[in-house]
Amino acid sequence: MKKQAGFTLVELVVVIAVLGILAATALPRFVNVQSNARVAAGNGLAASLRSAANLARASWIAAGSQAAQVQVQMDGQAVTVNAAGWPTGDAPGITAALQQLDGQFVGGYNNGTATYTVGGFAACTVVYTAADGRVVTNLSPANCGGN
């Protein structure tokens, strides 16, 4: 007669218990992956805003640095700039300079600033100020949906 091979009930219970413990310790780590991804996306947006603002200002300087608010051309896209040469904090300004804005960023404009929320979290923001071309971020896993 052939002896049957397989796992005993005790061995199966031990393996399930070990897998449960591993899952309980690993799950919180995976929960923060989404908020960390939002922080990374926000940092990418901040870098894009800085680059777009600097490129628009460089175009303004190359065009003669006129003091009045004018438009500069960036890859065929008209970008409105202020008297200091920075893109204005609205759709014809900084948003036009970006040329593409992913749907995960929602922009709002108020008094020369453009505020973009990341991933739908109100505290997870990137703010562009048109007066001096400054970009300030409020990005942390806690602000962007994490614990």
Regions found by a protein language model. Name each.
Residues 1-34:
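N-terminal single-pass transmembrane signal-anchor helix
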Residues 6-16, 53-65:
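Phosphate-binding glycine-rich loops and adjacent basic patches that engage nucleotide phosphates
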Residues 6-9, 16, 42, 95-98, ...:
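Generic N-terminal initiation segments characterized by hydrophobic and/or small/turn-forming residues
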Residues 19-20, 39-40, 50, 76, ...:
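Alpha-helical interaction segments
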Residues 25, 30-33, 42-49, 128:
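Generic recognition of well-ordered secondary-structure surfaces with a strong bias
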Residues 37-63:
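Membrane-proximal N-terminal amphipathic helix
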Residues 58-147:
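Periplasmic/extracellular, small/polar-rich flexible segments of pilin-like filament-forming proteins
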